[in-house]
């Protein structure tokens, strides 16, 4: 079993996420794409013992070695202004697609700011499904972004099945803020995946993700109370 995490300036949270995963489901291989521009995993004391584990692979993109974000955004000259997160949703979706192409196998996608509460093996037990997780409306519904999506906080992606059907997690024509053409810009993280799977006739499997994770969420990279969150949920990762 493999899990993949996209990290952006949250090394302490990402470390706790991995430890919580292993506490409840030992032996899962973990691949992390580090997109940090300030708090890199390689400089984090919290990762000192993790990076040497044979179960962990950290891919350093802190200098644009893998994905040059300036070049990436340059592909979308008519994009709308970013609402304060520098096109974070688009970058995250593209990072997930990069990881999918890189590992080429099914994996559990986890946000860097979730803590696993229980064994996640159930996510891997539906080989005929394109995804396993929970659908829901966009959290940006109050801004008119109401297209349904597969929640990205924790979900299983059956990469070989998606690849056979030509389905990609990232689609720049259906990614909010990358194009000014409505309604395409209303698609947030996981929304294109759900639409593409439905159009291809691929099934997903619903699981109540709140039973499996605790999520700091909503801009944790902005410096929300990380220490308090980790302290209150210490039993999940220590």
What do the predicted segments below correspond to?
Residues 118-144:
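Conserved donor-nucleotide/metal-binding helix-loop-beta segment in metal-dependent transferases, i.e.
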Residues 148-162:
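Short glycine- and hydrophobic/aromatic-rich loop-to-beta-strand nucleating segment
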Residues 154, 163-237:
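Catalytic core and acceptor-binding pocket of nucleotide-sugar-dependent glycosyltransferases
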Residues 104-115:
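Short beta-strand-to-loop acidic/aromatic patch adjacent to the donor-nucleotide binding site
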Residues 20-28:
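Short, acidic, metal-binding catalytic loop of nucleotide-sugar glycosyltransferases
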Residues 1-19:
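N-proximal low-complexity "stem/linker" segments adjacent to membrane-targeting elements
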Residues 27-39, 59-64:
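Short beta-strand/loop segment that forms part of the nucleotide-sugar
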Residues 43-102:
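Active-site-proximal specificity loops/subdomain of glycosyltransferases
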């Amino acid at each position: 079993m493999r899990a993949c995490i996209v990290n952006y300036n949250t090394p302490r949270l990402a470390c706790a996420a991995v430890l919580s995963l292993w506490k409840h489901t030992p032996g899962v291989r973990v691949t992390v794409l580090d997109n940090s521009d300030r708090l890199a995993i390689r400089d984090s004391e919290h990762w000192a013992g993790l990076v040497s584990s044979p179960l962990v692979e950290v891919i350093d993109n802190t200098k644009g070695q893998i994905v040059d974000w300036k070049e990436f955004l340059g592909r979308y000259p008519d994009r709308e202004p970013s609402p304060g997160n520098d096109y974070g949703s688009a970058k995250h979706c593209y990072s997930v697609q990069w990881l999918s192409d890189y590992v080429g196998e099914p994996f559990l996608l986890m946000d860097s700011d979730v803590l696993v509460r229980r064994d996640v093996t159930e996510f891997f037990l539906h080989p005929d499904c394109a995804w396993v997780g929970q659908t829901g409306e966009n959290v940006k519904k109050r801004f008119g972004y109401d297209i349904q999506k597969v929640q990205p906080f924790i979900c299983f992606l059956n990469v070989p099945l998606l690849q056979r059907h030509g389905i990609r997690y990232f689609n720049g024509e259906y990614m909010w803020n990358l194009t000014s053409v409505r309604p395409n810009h209303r698609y947030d993280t996981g929304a294109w995946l759900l639409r593409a799977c439905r159009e291809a006739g691929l099934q997903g499997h619903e699981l109540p993700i709140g039973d499996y994770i605790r999520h700091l969420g909503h801009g944790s990279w902005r410096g929300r109370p990380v220490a308090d969150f980790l302290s209150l949920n210490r039993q999940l990762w220590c």
